[in-house]
Amino acid sequence: MAITAQMVKELREKTGAGMMDCKKALTETNGDMEKAIDWLREKGIAKAAKKADRIAAEGMTLVEVDGNTAVILEVNSETDFVAKNEAFQTLVKELAAHLLKHKPATLEEALGQTMDNGATVQEHINAAIAKIGEKITLRRFEIVEKGENDVFGAYLHMGGRIGVLTLLAGSANQEVAKDVAMHIAALHPKYVSRDQVPQEEINREREVLKQQALNEGKPEHIVEKMVEGRLNKFYEDICLLEQAFVKNPDVKVRQYVESNGATVKTFIRYEVGEGMEKRQDNFAEEVMNQMRKQ
């Protein structure tokens, strides 16, 4: 029987299990929905799936480098309490090592790959869920390759609450690359330079600034000059090379990098849980919740 995307979607909604697990369950049971649910329960995946409705918005980021390849990843847990757990941190390192070795192109591909212990990545995560007692998800990752004349910079803030990976060309100085990564963690730029900012975003900002100036009662003949001046501030907020360097605000990041014979090729900045809903538990409740699981 052909397994359709709709069948996989239905099984995911019923069990909360991952896409690859649902597809395999349906394949093994010839598309029988109830048997597929039982198959997931038998494999211990349903136990993990019961936790799928919880919000996993804590966790940690990690950057690992192996020669000319680097990976940055984010793994989520439900509580900060578990994110500091040694077993959780070991899991994150194991996932990073696997990603570096096998270089999957997508999250779905990664979760379906077989690890050195014979389990798929998703099964390995499920085993950690059963052991630790919280929903855990590999949320995202990015693999970056460098040339011989390039250098990686890695920086983790607050034990991995924020992770940054930079790639610089023309400099073998890792300290420069790390300094830039630290700056990115602090100031959160969106782009390397202004030529990367989409024209649509510039036009939208320009129109907002124009209306602001008109609403302030400024004469139309000076509004355009005001808009251009304020656009420079907009670029400083979102473009790495336009920003004042955090370790020496007297120079721009562009000047700092160029003075060290380098250029910034790209960067990736992950912050745990960004863009996700978070539960509003206080720390006392978090401790109590953890104690109830023991």
UniProtKB/Swiss-Prot annotation:
One of its GO terms (molecular function) is translation elongation factor activity. It comes from the Bacteria. Keywords: Cytoplasm, Elongation factor, Protein biosynthesis. One of its GO terms (cellular component) is cytoplasm. Pfam families: EF-Ts_N, EF_TS. Coiled coil: none annotated. Gene3D superfamilies: 1.10.286.20, DNA helicase RuvA subunit, C-terminal domain, Elongation factor Ts, dimerisation domain. Transmembrane segments: none annotated. The keyword Protein biosynthesis applies. Residues 79-82 are annotated as: Involved in Mg(2+) ion dislocation from EF-Tu. PROSITE patterns: EF_TS_1, EF_TS_2. InterPro entries: EF-Ts_dimer_sf, Transl_elong_EFTs/EF1B, Transl_elong_EFTs/EF1B_dimer, Transl_elong_Ts_CS, UBA-like_sf. The keyword Protein biosynthesis applies. Associates with the EF-Tu.GDP complex and induces the exchange of GDP to GTP. It remains bound to the aminoacyl-tRNA.EF-Tu.GTP complex up to the GTP hydrolysis stage on the ribosome. This is Elongation factor Ts. It comes from Geobacillus sp. (strain WCH70).
